[in-house]
Amino acid sequence: NLTIMNNITLAPVKLKLMSEEEAKENALKLLKRVGLEEKADAYPASLSGGQKQRIAIVRSLAMNPRVMLFDEPTSALDPEMVGEVLEVMKELAESGMTMVVVTHEMGFAREVGTKVLFMDGGNIVEENTPQEFFTNPKSPRLQEFLSKVL
């Protein structure tokens, strides 16, 4: 079992993307960015679900990705923890990070997204700007979905 710091620095150091010192410096900066710098020496078992999810985001950011993929990042969280994860993701979007997010968090998609896709049965049913997607859905299937969730 590794500490949070060791979890974050493991991949960049093993892949020789950074020295151990650079990786630790970067990890502390990223932990501060998500409000968890005090957890650097903690173990994952001591974290809440929202904290674990924010640490997972930091682990990804430590690799300096150009794009981040999120698959229902809040689905397993206690409702009280959802906001802290969405806030980190919103900040990432505002900083210019390209993200592909699978979510049922419609408010988040509307507020943060630049393009929203609706899928049904593995097919893209509709794709549009958030404004058009939510105020003027074209497909009957999307209209039905939005009427149930909004």
Annotate the PLM regions:
Residues 68-71:
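Catalytic Walker B motif of ABC-type/P-loop ATPase nucleotide-binding domains
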Residues 43-47, 51:
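Conserved ABC ATPase signature
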Residues 62-66:
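A short, proline-enriched helix->beta-strand linker immediately N-terminal to the Walker B motif
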Residues 79-81:
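Helix N-cap at the start of a conserved alpha-helix in ABC-type nucleotide-binding domains
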Residues 103-104:
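H-loop/switch region of ABC-family ATPase nucleotide-binding domains
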Residues 1-10:
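Short coil-to-helix segment of the ABC ATPase nucleotide-binding domain corresponding to the Q-loop/switch region
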